[in-house]
UniProtKB/Swiss-Prot annotation:
This is ASTRA-associated protein 1. The gene is ASA1. Residues 250-295 are annotated as: Disordered. It comes from the Eukaryota. The keyword Magnesium does not apply. It comes from Yarrowia lipolytica (strain CLIB 122 / E 150) (Yeast). The keyword Transcription regulation does not apply. One of its GO terms (biological process) is chromatin organization. WD repeats lie at residues 15-52, 55-93, 122-163, 171-209, 217-259, 323-362, 364-418. Component of the ASTRA complex involved in chromatin remodeling. It is found in: Nucleus. Keywords: Chromatin regulator, Nucleus, Repeat, WD repeat. Its main location: nucleus.
């Protein structure tokens, strides 16, 4: 793909009447959620819906495949649901597959829902997505938006493991939790104040997880944190123009004296916040090349910030790159960890190499982009060639603010390349 031109999607999925806010692949399926609370379950074989239902009263924040038949959804309505999704012998779900029109999008009475197996009240004040891996769920604490709660899925229900997770460091204010990720018994947290933290969640006998890493690496709120699938590293992006690569270590950051937290409390749903619309301005100049808490060649330390390295041993990122575009959200890594993808506030999707965070591709949605997702290809011994292709293809999904979902494919080779030039990752 030439950077001077736009790639052509291999498929365009139409159906949502509101901006797409969440996407998640699983095997030959894709699920998508929108700003009005609707969920679409798509087949990548037919590229048509298998089921459509109104899952939440407000925007979908998270979609998580817990296993091949259970889908977790989180909404801005402070609810988390677990649905059972099944197909019959003919590949039918028994649910509606007719997309709602814009005139009836808020009247879901004609759309039966899948079997709801579990419901939980959560704190969605932050717009923070939940994180899930191998039966563990991380989410913002129900009572304090600057803390994290860790739960475990056991016998068809979530049980609290820890409910008061935050960096216990003297004199710091992290702001609210913005994004979460779990990888290899490590909990990664991004904060409103620009900090990121890593906690060790392997020892259940402790009354709080060990803090392994803490650094303020952004001058704006952190929007995304994602762990590398094989390396002990993670990357973060924020409302500023930096993509920062961090280490994941087993060190212990000294914390102030801690008292054992109180047991988890079952409180009422937090009050709904007042939502203020902010006009998007793609012409914004990128912020100053400023990173707090560490030294990076070519970047200046923000005035007035005193770095106390003795409080944060080895809390220094591996790399930081100013990509000159503010507002990098929905950051994703492909299954091999070779590529980084972001959805920009300027409506552009950007692909970077992981190793040196160099830009390899830029393309955009006409009406703006809300979220992006990579698939994880699997091997297949099926006799159905269409199903085999859907399972083994490396998909990219781009959710637009116009309600459309664009599907692209990455051609897999020795170097994941196609064609000539710097940008060879997207099939035309």
């Amino acid at each position: 793909m030439d950077l001077s031109g736009a790639p052509v999607p291999v498929a365009l999925l139409r159906g949502h009447t509101h901006p797409v806010t969440s996407l998640r692949f699983y095997n030959a399926f894709l699920v998508s959620g929108d700003e009005s609370g609707w969920v679409f379950w798509w087949s990548l074989v037919t590229r048509r819906p298998l089921a459509i239902w109104k899952a939440h009263h407000e925007a979908i924040l998270s979609l998580v495949w817990m296993d091949e038949t259970h889908l977790l959804t989180q909404g801005r309505d402070d609810k988390l649901y677990v649905w059972r999704l099944e197909l019959d012998a003919q590949g039918k779900s028994g649910l509606s597959v007719k997309p709602p029109s814009s005139l009836v999008a808020d009247d879901p009475t004609d759309y039966p829902k899948p079997w709801l197996t579990y419901s939980l009240t959560v704190n969605s004040l932050n717009f923070c997505q939940v994180a899930w891996v191998n039966g563990l769920l991380a989410k913002p604490d129900l009572d304090s938006s600057d803390k994290v709660e860790l739960l475990e899925w056991t016998d068809g229900a979530f049980r609290v493991v820890w409910n008061d997770i935050y960096p216990r460091l003297n004199g710091i204010k992290t702001g609210i939790v913005m994004d979460l990720n779990i990888m290899n018994k490590k909990l990664i947290v991004g904060y409103e104040g620009g900090a990121v933290a890593v906690f060790d969640i392997s020892d259940r006998n402790r009354y709080t997880p060990v803090l392994n890493y803490y650094v303020v690496s952004h001058v704006q709120p952190v929007l995304s944190v994602r762990a590398h699938p094989t390396k002990k590293e993670f990357v973060s992006s924020s409302a500023d123009s930096l993509i920062v690569k961090h280490p994941i270590k087993d060190q212990v950051v000294p914390e102030e004296e801690m008292e054992e937290p109180e047991p988890a409390k079952n409180s009422e749903r937090p009050p709904s916040p007042k939502i203020v619309e902010v006009e998007d301005s793609p012409e914004l100049e990128p912020p100053k090349n400023v990173v707090r808490g560490f030294d990076v060649p070519g970047l200046e330390l923000e005035e007035g910030i005193e770095v106390k390295e003795e409080e944060k041993p080895e809390s220094k990122p591996l790399d930081a790159v100013n990509v000159r575009h503010s507002g990098l959200s929905s950051l994703q890594l492909d299954s091999d960890g070779d590529l980084i993808m972001t959805a920009g506030w300027d409506g552009k999707v950007r692909l970077f190499t992981y190793d040196d965070i160099s830009k390899v591709s830029v393309f955009h949605e006409r009406e703006g982009v809300g979220c992006v997702a990579f698939s994880t290809p699997t091997t297949s011994d099926t006799a159905n060639p269409r199903l085999a292709k859907a399972l083994t293809t490396r998909w990219i999904a781009v959710g637009g603010k116009d309600g459309k979902i664009e599907l692209y494919t990455i051609q897999q080779g020795n170097e994941k390349t196609l064609g000539e030039g710097r940008s060879k990752y997207i099939r035309h």
